[in-house]
Design a protein with these regions (language model features):
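Catalytic cores of nucleotide-sugar-dependent glycosyltransferases that transfer UDP/GDP/TDP-activated
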Residues: 1-361
Length: 361
């Protein structure tokens, strides 16, 4: 198949990944290429060139040290630049003669313009409903041309008022990149990811201390005020922050932990950290929010619906007793990126056939 992959433009699609969406776009594009498809990734210019990138936005204002774009005093500058990048692409997308457009942009323009394009589009819903996307989808629904896929059943339920019976394909990870460690060497808890209020890092530290376990925090600071105010004061000899680590080092940190602590403070649509932890054999303790209750089973973790630090502390010690083998088996059966990509290939084939059938007399 000849596939156009539309990335979002907040960050280049390259390592180190700023978040799960960048990782998803990178991995799925790479696998589609490896499977022999003719793939073009439409992304910002500093994205990984091995992904056959067609740059639609300059990264002259992107700081590779802070992994962020320089902010103009004109609050609309980023918005307008992104709007026109997608607008110009969608105006000429049919000229490329793609079989299908795989839309991961989290932007309203491709959805709006897809109603005027001949090339069929599959849009992935990576987040709960946001204003711009809702408005575009409601308008596009009149044309019945779009195919939507949600990354979890929980996320699909939130989109139900706008997209009834949305298809669901769970996100997956490359299990070959995450080594299973059957016998962990540490009794510490681990929290890893972006340090941001949405991720609730300080709750994990407080709960681990209450549980009597040391905790390691691995991740970059995505919100400096939050880090300085809520996280840094809790760091001590029993709460260590590992700011920078390679993929191999992160694998070791996860695999040797007794338990991973995952504390979403919003309705997390999926949470790749869950899959990564289970792939390494490390059970999960966390808040029962967003997609976590649909991903974490009683054999692989312990969740608290109350989101209290006291109950999370109990979950930490309970989860640490669970079978590490069961965690890896669950990752292999339900969270493998190979299964995920195959499911998307099936969707693409259906959409392409449906589009072709319209033109059969």
């Amino acid at each position: 198949m000849k596939i156009a992959v539309l990335a979002h433009l907040k960050h280049p699609i390259r390592k180190p990944f700023m978040g799960g969406l960048e990782a998803f776009t990178y991995e799925v594009t790479k696998l589609l290429l490896q499977r022999g498809h003719e793939v073009t990734l439409f992304a910002s210019e500093h994205s990984d060139p091995s992904l056959n990138v067609h740059a639609i936005l300059s990264d002259v204002d992107y700081d590779m040290e802070t992994l962020s774009r320089f902010r103009s005093h004109e609050l609309s500058e980023d918005f307008i630049s992104t709007h026109h990048a997608y607008l110009e692409l969608m105006q000429e997308i049919d000229q490329y003669d793609f079989d299908v457009i795989f839309n991961n942009s989290l932007n309203y323009v491709p959805i709006t313009m897809a109603t005027l394009a001949e090339t069929p589009m599959v849009t992935v819903l990576h987040t709960p409903p946001i204003f711009e996307m809702k408005k575009a989808i409601m308008a596009a629904n009149r044309y019945n041309k779009m195919t939507y896929v949600s990354v979890s059943q929980t996320n699909a339920s939130m989109w139900e008022p706008y997209i009834p019976n949305c298809k669901v394909i769970h996100n997956g990870i490359d299990l070959n990149k995450w080594s299973y460690i059957a016998n962990n060497s540490g009794e510490y808890a681990l929290w890893f990811g972006r340090i941001h209020p949405d991720k609730g890092t300080h709750f994990a530290i407080a709960a681990a201390k209450l549980a009597g376990r040391p905790i390691k925090i691995a991740g970059s600071v995505a919100d400096k005020h939050y880090f300085e105010t809520f996280v840094k004061p809790l760091l001590d000899e029993n709460a260590e922050w590992v700011e920078h680590c390679t993929h191999e080092q992160l694998n070791e940190l996860i695999g040797n932990a007794a338990v991973s602590v995952i504390t979403p403070c919003w309705e997390e649509p999926f949470g790749l950290v869950v899959a990564e932890s289970l792939a390494c054999g490390t059970p999960v303790a966390g808040f029962a929010r967003g997609a976590l209750p649909k991903i974490v089973t009683k054999e692989t973790g312990c969740l608290t619906a109350s989101c209290s630090v006291t109950e999370l502390a109990n979950c930490i010690n309970d989860a640490a007793q669970l079978s590490r083998k069961a965690c890896r088996v669950h990752a292999e059966s339900s969270l493998d990126i190979q299964h995920m990509v195959s499911s998307y290939e099936n969707i693409f084939a259906q959409v392409i056939k449906k589009c072709a059938d319209k033109y059969v007399l």
